């Protein structure tokens, strides 16, 4: 009989475990069923969304805010923590911003602030409806641009997973990550017209432990741009294009910028972009440092500047052209990069005369020019370390003497 006596307690323990597991399932806060949201594309979602967030954030057990399928108009929303327990947002529907840029007085549309243990998922779409903004966003119209909203902002967010979300036609950046730690963005889809200005796919700064994985980015500016203070970051399995490539920077434009270090970009495909793997710093008086940057296993398809270090970065020729960049670049590698260049200059290393690039490595490079001329490589103020087979031959071409005007 003793063996049978042992079975009953075991079954009882399993039952208790099952009951306990069922209790830790997140409580659902449905913006339609519980908070009165209407998926009619006209009624503002802001209050139901914020009310659902506040109630979920105050819960002492894990919770999920649910936005069901349908089309919702959202004027803007600021979702703040800290929350008392882990919190999720399950976005199944399409959330649209007001199309008129004048509806925004600051650069925020959907903002998450000071949230920990957060997840957003569901296959939903954040549609910035940016077409009117694109027409008015010119180099001269700075005041207008300063009020354009980012589609989704993550500010001071820790331990987060953003998964299976689409950002469409943002008026400015699609996603901005600032002062975040341990945040993963995975299986995202980002799309805007190739002529849409300042629509960086994902931009980050002053963040650590950011991972961007298995995402498709088509936009009018950098697919991914990495600002100052970014550390220990992984970017992999990205398809980029159209756009301006994957960029470190721009850096050196402002005082007291923090170092960028420990960035690995690998297993990416970049197609029909103006740049591929790029580091860009401004000429002028402000310093900074960039180190341990590694581009590896990247395919370039018809990219105008596949490999580029540009320390004379000067978009629209608005910089101090006669000054050298004060940003120090060191320990940078480009390995196993292959494909085609739309222009003959497949590799450009334009480093600072006052602070030359240190320990720049080229290994196993094979980039063919799509035109009749052979691909070339240009070098200024750098002596790259070379490993393996290299095409084009390093530093084989002339060096431009004026700052570049590419964005």
From Swiss-Prot:
Glycans are attached at residues 182, 267, 272, 302, 331. The keyword Cell wall biogenesis/degradation applies. Its EC number is 3.2.1.15. Its main location: secreted. Keywords: Cell wall, Cell wall biogenesis/degradation, Disulfide bond, Glycoprotein, Glycosidase, Hydrolase, Repeat, Secreted, Signal. InterPro entries: Glyco_hydro_28 (IPR000743), PbH1 (IPR006626), Pectin_lyas_fold (IPR012334), Pectin_lyase_fold/virulence (IPR011050). Residues 1-26 form the signal peptide. It is found in: Secreted; Secreted, Cell wall. It holds the Pfam family Glyco_hydro_28. GO terms for molecular function: polygalacturonase activity. Pollen. The keyword RNA-binding does not apply. The active site is at residues 221, 244. It catalyses: (1,4-alpha-D-galacturonosyl)n+m + H2O = (1,4-alpha-D-galacturonosyl)n + (1,4-alpha-D-galacturonosyl)m. It is an enzyme of class 3 (hydrolase). One of its GO terms (cellular component) is extracellular region. Disulfide bonds join 223-240, 351-357, 379-395. SUPFAM superfamilies: Pectin lyase-like. GO terms for biological process: carbohydrate metabolic process; cell wall organization. Belongs to the glycosyl hydrolase 28 family. May function in the depolymerization of the pectin in its walls during pollen tube elongation, or in that of the pistil during pollination. This is Polygalacturonase. It comes from Gossypium barbadense. The gene is G9.
